[in-house]
Amino acid sequence: MVWLRAPDRVVVHPSTVEGRVEAPPSKSYTHRMLFLALLARGRSVVRRPLVSNDTLATLNAVALLGGKPRLGRGVAEVEGGEVRGGAVVYAAGSGTTIRIAMGVAAHSAEATLLYGDESLNRRPVHPLSEALRSMGARVCDTGGNPPVKVSGPLRRASVEVDAAISSQFATSLLIAGSRLGEFELSAARLSSRGYVDITLESLSMFGVRVEREGYRLFRLRGTPKPVDAAVPGDYSSASFMLAAGAIAGRVEVEGLRPVDPQPDRRIVELLRSMGARVRVEGGVVAVESTGPLEPVDVDLDGSPDLAPVAAVLAAYARGVSRLRGLERLKYKESDRLSAIAWNLARLGVEARVRGGILEIRGGGVEGGVARSWGDHRIAMAMAVAGLGARRPVAVEGFSRVPDSYPGFLEDLARLGARVEAVKGGGV
């Protein structure tokens, strides 16, 4: 497996940005569509997939679990139909990969061992393990975390799961359950519901009939069929470029669906509420700075991946912002809540964590040295923070950015940002 690489250290100088970039393909859709292509009997064509380290981990898992993937320029083809166990699957830092792969691996009687890097092996899978066991799978995890060994078959077509920690538990069970022909999932305390909406849209795309009672009960009918479909643009990655426009100029991002279940589409509403000039026309979102931003009091429980960039926007607001609903950030690639507060303090911004609330006293960013803590979204958010700072911002540990947005630096430079990269190292 060849991983994408990026510099270890990046320095972002105060800059004015202007121009248009294309949104990267959605990471969430790419993961789901590749795994569903493995479960569909026949050849699927996934157009415009995201090629990042996280999705390469999924492509590798698909191959090890019995699919025959081929990655070309702007397209991924997968010959699916048979799930094969007996493999050792390395998911790198991708929680989506390992959790969906656990459910898929339970369709084989041969045991599959799944593990990740140090950060992934600290992320919980226990509720998913319990749900798969109740369906008849044999699951042995490590104190509730990876590494985890899974073997099937799945004998029961209905299950309950506690999805308070992560909606990925529900996503894994829905994708695995789609292979059974009929399946029913009861999800308790479902978090980040928009990501389950992405899963349901992906299932429908592959011909699975979906019925639901709110976000509590889901029923599936039919099995996945091969598709020829394209991946939509990613609001999560686009949020960084849109924030750059709100802080330091004017940015347009194309390739974003105006109507989309992605939770991070909320960035558009957030930027408007903070006083940035926002225009949405067709598949283009344009954001322009109007001066200092306005503080907000906002609950991000449904869109936790926006927290790093929302915190940076709050640093440029004139007043105190409160970002709520952030309790689950400690289960991300880093303890994301602590990492955000730590970095803002390093850059001269007053930030305080109170339970699941992050309070930020805005007024601008001084500059200094930030650290990614091994988290791609923290790295990108701190780079954006440097655009309007009083002096440069250096971001250490930038090499994780290709996990989700390999073209981030190139897009930032295309918009006119002054960026210095120190080569070397990798993911």
Swiss-Prot record:
GO terms for biological process: amino acid biosynthetic process; aromatic amino acid family biosynthetic process; chorismate biosynthetic process. Transmembrane segments: none annotated. It is an enzyme of class 2 (transferase). One of its GO terms (molecular function) is 3-phosphoshikimate 1-carboxyvinyltransferase activity. The keyword Transport does not apply. InterPro entries: Enolpyruvate_Tfrase_dom (IPR001986), Enolpyruvate_Tfrase_sf (IPR036968), EPSP_synthase (IPR006264), EPSP_synthase_CS (IPR023193), RNA3'P_cycl/enolpyr_Trfase_a/b (IPR013792). GO terms for cellular component: cytoplasm. It comes from the Archaea. SUPFAM superfamilies: EPT/RTPC-like. Its EC number is 2.5.1.19. Pathway: Metabolic intermediate biosynthesis; chorismate biosynthesis. It holds the Pfam family EPSP_synthase. The active site is at D305. Gene3D superfamilies: Enolpyruvate transferase domain. Phosphoenolpyruvate binds at K27, G95, R123, Q168, R336, R377. 3-phosphoshikimate binds at K27, S28, R32, S166, S167, Q168, S192, D305, K332. Catalyzes the transfer of the enolpyruvyl moiety of phosphoenolpyruvate (PEP) to the 5-hydroxyl of shikimate-3-phosphate (S3P) to produce enolpyruvyl shikimate-3-phosphate and inorganic phosphate. Monomer. This is 3-phosphoshikimate 1-carboxyvinyltransferase. It comes from Aeropyrum pernix (strain ATCC 700893 / DSM 11879 / JCM 9820 / NBRC 100138 / K1). The gene is aroA.
